[in-house]
UniProtKB/Swiss-Prot annotation:
It comes from Human cytomegalovirus (strain AD169). Keywords: Virion, Virion tegument. It is found in: Virion tegument. The keyword ATP-binding does not apply. It holds the Pfam family US22. It comes from the Viruses. Its main location: virion. InterPro entries: US22-like. This is Tegument protein US24. The lineage of its organism: Viruses, Duplodnaviria, Heunggongvirae, Peploviricota, Herviviricetes. One of its GO terms (cellular component) is viral tegument.
Length: 501
């Protein structure tokens, strides 16, 4: 991909981007990023037409605007080049309605000051950032040819940034970050146990693994950014699943129907990784989400309380899964791609973000006096109302200086959700999901050595080299290793895209 930091002016002369802005080193102020996004996008917020946005990008080419959390994500303003033009054409075909998408530039990650050197002050990404109506922000992946809705409006962008989007957790991004920065060891609480999850078969010659904090036995913590931490119980076989609810209530015929449906949906050999849920003292573990891997390492999930039990992809790799958890289930319906590609990848279908805009446009026509004889009067009124809205966004009384957004003050409040998130889902409290109770129980079992390595492997390999392929360092750290072989794929007649379980 072309370096987003370089560009050319209208006369063909090279345009050098301004010096990269300094990132805040300290994190004492939890609202610093929120205010930074509001400041950076202020002029764009008042742009009434796509051409105004384009002129702003031309005037400020090379400037970096903050995209909010995670810290470091910015959009570097760039006028249209070949890549951006192609991305704009592709994105316009993916969007569900006729919404004008104006390119802002490339998404980049600025490195903190201590980690920058003379040449590498940022990490380029394959994402082109667009702005739509009502300050909606989209990002188009030029490699995998899909687009995600980053935020519905400026307020959501300032609060959550790209933390609700899958683009922030891709392996390609984090691999580049590790290569360009000083490695920082992951810190776990004092006395914490860890579990390595290893995936290894003929499709992954080098193998891949992720590390999770282990609670007790095969229970590990799975964190979903913006949602919370839940308990995930790693499983090896279907027989182990029959010990937990609701699988323990299935008859043999119903169980066979389940696994046949999973096999038909994935169309490859597959592994059981485990289930998320909550333990019940003296009773069966309650499974809420079943997590599977296909032969190529992609991670899928089945929501148990969904009557259709659709199999949906939640991550491309096991490392991405333990990095973003169930993000694509909690904040779903934000991905736009070709229908055939969506069906092949088994992604959630997007929901139209323009659902309520007809009523909004009607109210705007009333407020902005569309019937006014002078168009300048209408534009002046529109800018005045936008200024009032922007001033409201900047009110400090909307937030608590220590807790962040005002709705976080009430632990029983509903998650701030739209129609594309899980409706009526309460803010995850550790006591509700059983994390704190499990930690208290684990504290009483300090002598627990338990499994340290969970392997998803092919023990039968066609080559000697494959049979001897092992990550030795992980095995030596392990007091007890568990193995999970893939379930075999039996040929099916015909093509069945989606089979309800």
């Amino acid at each position: 991909m072309m370096d987003p930091a370089a560009g050319s002016g209208p006369d063909g002369a090279a345009v050098m981007p301004p010096e990269l802005p300094a990132l805040p080193v300290a994190a004492e102020d939890p609202m610093a990023l929120y205010r930074q996004v509001l400041r950076d996008f202020k002029e764009l917020f008042f742009c009434l037409e796509p051409m105004e946005i384009t002129r702003y990008v031309h005037r400020n080419e090379g400037r970096c605007l903050s995209l909010g959390p995670p810290k470091g994500w910015h959009v570097m303003l760039r006028t249209e080049d070949g890549i951006i033009t192609a991305a704009k054409q592709a994105a316009s075909k993916l969007i569900c309605c006729r919404e004008p998408l104006t390119p802002l530039g490339y998404a980049v990650i600025l490195l903190p000051e201590p980690r920058r050197d003379h040449h590498d002050g940022m990490v380029a990404t394959p994402y082109v950032v667009f702005m739509g109506r009502f300050s909606r922000v989209y990002a188009y992946d030029t490699r995998e040819k899909y687009m995600v809705l980053v935020s519905h409006n400026l307020d959501e962008l300032a609060r959550y940034g790209v933390s609700r989007s899958e683009i922030a957790y891709r392996d390609v991004i984090h691999t580049t970050l590790r290569r360009m920065t000083v490695p920082v060891p992951r810190r776990y609480p004092k006395g914490a146990r860890t579990m390595h999850v290893l995936f290894l078969n003929d499709t992954t010659p080098e193998g891949s693994y992720a590390t999770a904090e282990r609670i007790l036995g095969c229970d590990v913590k799975l964190h979903t950014p913006g949602y919370g931490t839940v308990i995930m119980r790693l499983m090896k076989t279907v027989q182990q699943l029959h010990r937990i609810w609701p699988f323990c209530a299935l008859t043999e015929v119903e169980s066979r129907r389940w696994w046949w449906a999973v096999r038909a949906n994935l169309a490859t050999p597959w592994y059981v990784l485990g289930v998320t849920g909550r333990p019940r003292p003296g009773r069966s573990f309650v499974a809420e989400v079943l997590v599977l891997l296909d032969w190529f390492g992609a991670v899928y999930a089945i929501q148990m309380d969904d009557p259709n039990h659709y199999v949906r992809r939640v991550a491309n790799t096991i490392t991405e899964f333990f990095r973003m958890g169930l993000l694509k289930m909690v904040f779903r319906h934000r991905r736009f791609e070709r229908e055939r590609q969506r069906q092949t990848r088994m992604e959630h279908r997007h929901l139209c973000p323009h659902h309520h805009e007809r009523a909004v446009d009607h109210k705007r026509d009333i407020l902005f006096n569309e019937d006014a004889a002078l168009p300048d009067e209408r534009r002046e009124r529109e800018r005045r109302i936008l200024q009032q809205q922007y001033d409201w966004l900047c009110l400090t009384e909307r937030f608590d200086p220590h807790e962040g957004a005002w709705e976080r003050l009430d632990p029983n409040t509903l998650v701030l959700h739209r129609y594309d998130t899980n409706s009526q889902s309460y803010v995850l409290d550790p006591d509700i999901v059983g994390v704190e109770a499990a930690e208290r129980e684990a504290a009483g079992h300090q002598d627990d050595t338990g499994p340290r390595l969970h392997c998803l492997v092919t023990t039968r390999s066609s080559t000697r080299e494959g049979a001897e392929r092992v990550i030795t360092a992980l095995v030596h750290q392990s007091r007890l290793v568990t193995y999970s072989d893939p379930f075999p794929l039996k040929s099916l007649t015909g093509v069945r895209e989606y089979i309800q379980i």
